Amino acid sequence: MLVIPAVDMKNKKCVQLIQGNPDKKHVELDNPPEIAKKWVSEGAEMLHLVDLDGALDGKRVNDEFIEEIIKTSGVPVQIGGGIRSIEDAVYLVEKGAKKVIIGTIAVEKPEIIKELSENIGSEKIMVSLDAKDGKVVIKGWKEKTKYTPVEIGKILEEMGAGSILFTNVDSEGLLNGINIEPTKELVENLKIPIVASGGVTTIDDLLKFKEIGVYGVVVGSAIYKNMINLKDAIEAVK
């Protein structure tokens, strides 16, 4: 199982938000490319980049850093935040992204995933599903849909999604542990790899995810606040 450090960018800084709220930050650091290099030096085999300006405002202002991280980190990079069109996704793949993470638009128009998979190949498409109170939420967690994660997950798998990034919003950024059940349901009901995110605070949390068969876990606040040592975490889940 992969332990995948998050490098979330807002206003050209590396940040960690509390429950996705742009006004509530745990962490704010300069020079995201340097942070990315630090995680790779500690053993990260993949990086998770999020353009929060893109996600929240639909404007991509961190492209320069994203390109630098892809070029200099030496590991595969999955990228999300503000990818609202096929053109956006193709642009990032051409720049060298291993996977592009598609959120809101995939839930609103699942057929776009079919079109995208024909353009860039399904292995490059990761769909981000965020759930709150058992339902998928979109538009930066502001709007609740009628779908459960498994319902929309099955549709997206059929359309050609290559993997799912699943965030349990109820746990995200609160640093008080995880609820494993929603992720477990996805792993049991879908064939494509699931990467989990949200609420990891201990190596024990990571081991619980490993036990249910996820492909990887994105870690954010816990490594930035030194609650988890990344090297130890990677070693523990090998």
Swiss-Prot record:
A single GO BP: L-tryptophan biosynthetic process
Pathway: Amino-acid biosynthesis; L-histidine biosynthesis; L-histidine from 5-phospho-alpha-D-ribose 1-diphosphate: step 4/9
Keyword annotations from UniProtKB, A to Z: Amino-acid biosynthesis, Cytoplasm, Histidine biosynthesis, Isomerase
Residue numbers annotated as active site: D8, D130
Record's GO cellular component terms: cytoplasm
Compartmental location: Cytoplasm
Keyword Cytoplasm: yes
Catalytic activity: 1-(5-phospho-beta-D-ribosyl)-5-[(5-phospho-beta-D-ribosylamino)methylideneamino]imidazole-4-carboxamide = 5-[(5-phospho-1-deoxy-D-ribulos-1-ylimino)methylamino]-1-(5-phospho-beta-D-ribosyl)imidazole-4-carboxamide
The protein's name: 1-(5-phosphoribosyl)-5-[(5-phosphoribosylamino)methylideneamino] imidazole-4-carboxamide isomerase
Lineage per the UniProt record: Archaea, Methanobacteriati, Methanobacteriota, Methanomada group, Methanococci
